[in-house]
A protein has these predicted regions:
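Extracytosolic helix-loop segments that constitute the early lumenal/periplasmic catalytic or substrate-binding loops
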Residues: 190-195, 205-231, 235, 243-246
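Transmembrane-helix motifs of polytopic, lipid-linked glycan transferases
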Residues: 159-166, 256-281, 314, 318, ...
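Hydrophobic, aromatic-rich transmembrane alpha-helices
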Residues: 163-168, 370, 450-499, 503
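Short helix- or helix-capping micro-motifs
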Residues: 185-188, 289-294, 342-346
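Perimembrane helix-loop-helix junctions
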Residues: 171, 322-328, 355-389, 393, ...
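Aromatic-lined ligand-binding clefts that engage carbohydrates, nucleic acids, or primary amines
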Residues: 63-87, 126-130
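Loop-to-helix entry region of an early transmembrane alpha helix in multi-pass inner-membrane enzymes
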Residues: 234, 238, 248-271, 469-473
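Transmembrane-helix signature of polytopic, membrane-embedded enzymes
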Residues: 176, 252-256, 273-295, 314, ...
Length: 577
């Protein structure tokens, strides 16, 4: 034990050292000043305040390259840049695609700046003149460092991180195959997070940022109608506001800090999801389900996304793990873990009413015996569960699930006719690689089409090149085959308490989605991101469907080929974004 601890301590110290070196070598943005209506105001990035439509304003900031050999400024103007000056030299901003596009933004590298300046330097004074198109006005700018030393520090840090994972896994006697699959998921999320701007492929990111800023800067939780997303439960935003404050103290871009915080939460979701699968399956079925969970595209897409989805996934996975361990061992301490995680999940995202449904079923299955037979920990767990369930029921019955539904426009309205819930348009699903909330021809009217397609790629057209379309089409085709394996696995499964639990979980998640779409008839109400943890019900059936003892060798080979093709294509697509 001492040797293991000694090794782990050295690994942690090594990671801390290279994290500090990376921070020291990174460039930074400082001295941000907003010039508006004759008033100069010191600001921090991002700058986002209410302005009049057509109002002109300007922003100054200093960019220090530090020890970084190179850097790239990622600038998102709100809404249009009208002039761009660096160290007194006007830059040809109109040649930068995205200079008048908040969502797209534009990149400004050190090499581009030096080319226009005619000389190299490490300190840059940037002056931007902008015009607001309406609503909030301002700018978001992030600086990312480059150069050999930063790359070297990052590589060494992540090598030490992988070694730390294997060391911890060995200590807790976790299967090497699961550790390897976890590392695959870890590296995939590192690569995707590192290459993804904080608001890329996000949902209501501006509202989430506003929510965090209010808590971080004003030390209060805002009223539910104070911002676009302020109706959400506060747990995730309070935690993120703490990260935001720490980032400001360290002169680090707060949105990037929150992005990496979400990445860490995604590892909790990944790890506890694998632990759940290990309590449901074993052998080859476990390996297949675990690999799919690790690389499932929509799950990876959520990893760096600013929003409360990923914390809900993590807490639901912890709660499900607690329920499964309690069923397997009858130790009440696991049910206490499940109750606490469920309560946190509900105060993170209201979708966690399903988490409490799973918890309630576990309670009924395990506590339906004379109270005298309950252990002390089970009695404590029962008391905590009842108190938490009453609290959640009171809140759920008195609050809207979607507090900003009235703000959606008619372009995302859909028809809730019965046929749209029973029909699956297989041709559209296979021939149209992506979907979105606006176009009927992409399948948004059909409940199962939209749910299945967003389970893979979200509501985004990820990569519209020939390569991206080919990969997305292959993934969609493999999905249909995996669905077939899942139905077979469900049919042949032996029904014990664990199978009942995951089946009821799947039913509750799908029923919740149907109810949400019926109550709020918008295409975005049908997005799979609300129920990603349902994969922890479905993937065991997929793995069991082609890897069970009764499966023929041909079926096993076919199933593994499809699983590996799905996994490889998903990784290639995500790393091509």
């Amino acid at each position: 034990m001492r040797k293991i601890l000694k090794r782990e301590v050295f690994l942690v110290l090594g990671m801390a050292l290279f994290a500090v070196l990376s921070y020291a070598f990174n460039p930074e943005i400082k001295n941000v000043v907003l010039h508006r209506q004759g008033v100069d105001s010191a600001m921090t990035m991002p700058v986002s305040i209410p302005m009049e439509s057509g109002e002109n304003f300007s922003i100054d900031m200093d960019v220090s390259a530090g020890f970084a050999g190179d850097f790239v400024l990622n600038i998102h103007p709100d809404d249009c840049v009208t002039d761009l000056i660096v160290n007194g030299v006007h830059l040809p901003f109109q040649s930068y695609s995205g200079y008048c596009n908040w969502n797209q933004g534009f990149l400004l590298s050190k090499a581009e700046i030096v080319k226009n300046l005619g000389k190299d330097t490490s300190d840059f004074h940037v002056q931007m003149s902008l015009i607001n198109g309406g609503g909030l006005g301002g700018v978001t700018a992030v600086v990312d460092g480059g150069g050999f030393m930063l790359v070297l520090f990052s590589v060494i840090f992540f090598v030490l991180l992988v070694a730390f994972v294997f060391s911890i896994g060995t200590r807790f006697k976790i299967r090497r195959s699961l550790l390897l699959i976890f590392v695959i998921g870890l590296l995939l999320r590192i690569g995707y997070t590192n290459e993804t701007f904080f608001d890329k492929r996000g949902h209501d990111v501006g509202g989430h940022v506003h929510y965090m800023k209010i808590i971080a800067e004003e030390n209060r939780v805002p009223a539910s109608n104070e911002c676009w997303t302020c109706y959400h439960p506060p747990v995730y935003f309070v935690l993120s506001a703490g990260v935001w404050k720490m980032a400001n103290l360290m002169h680090y871009f707060p949105q990037n800090a929150v992005k990496w915080f979400d990445f860490l939460i995604s590892l909790v979701a990944l790890g506890f999801g694998l632990a759940c699968l290990a309590n449901i399956l074993s052998g080859p079925p476990l390996s297949a389900a675990a690999l799919l969970w690790s690389v499932w595209p929509s799950f990876v897409l959520a990893s760096p996304r600013l929003g409360n989805d990923i914390l809900f996934y993590a807490m639901h996975a912890v709660a499900l793990w607690g329920c499964l361990k309690y069923i397997r061992t009858n130790y009440g301490k696991y049910f206490i873990v499940a109750v606490v995680a469920s309560f946190i999940a509900y105060w993170t995202k209201s979708t966690a009413v399903v988490t409490f449904g799973v918890l309630g079923l576990t309670f009924l299955m395990q506590f339906c015996r004379h109270p005298r037979l309950w252990s002390r920990s089970e009695r404590v767990a029962a008391g905590i569960f009842i108190a938490a369930a009453i609290t959640v029921a009171c809140v759920a019955l008195t609050h809207d699930v979607v507090g900003n539904a009235g703000g959606n426009d008619d372009t995302v309205l859909i028809r809730n006719v019965p046929g749209n819930f029973f029909f699956f348009d297989l041709q559209t699903f296979l021939t149209k690689p992506y979907t979105d909330p606006w176009h009927d021809e992409l399948g948004r009217q059909y409940f199962w089409n939209y749910l299945a397609k967003t389970s893979l790629f979200g509501e985004f057209k990820l990569l519209e090149t020939s390569k991206g379309i080919t990969l997305a089409s292959i993934i969609s085709t493999c999905f249909v085959a995996l669905l077939g394996f899942g139905l077979r696995g469900l049919w042949i499964s032996r029904w014990d308490k664990v199978q009942v639990l995951i089946a009821v979980q799947a039913f509750l998640f799908f029923a919740a989605m149907i109810v949400l779409r019926l109550k709020y008839p918008f295409s975005c109400s049908n997005d799979f991101r609300y129920i990603v943890p349902v994969l922890l019900s479905c993937l065991p059936w997929v793995g069991f469907g082609f890897c069970s003892g009764g499966a023929s060798p041909k079926l096993k080979v076919c199933g593994w080929c499809i699983t590996l093709i799905f996994a490889v294509c998903s990784v290639v697509l995500l790393m091509s974004l």
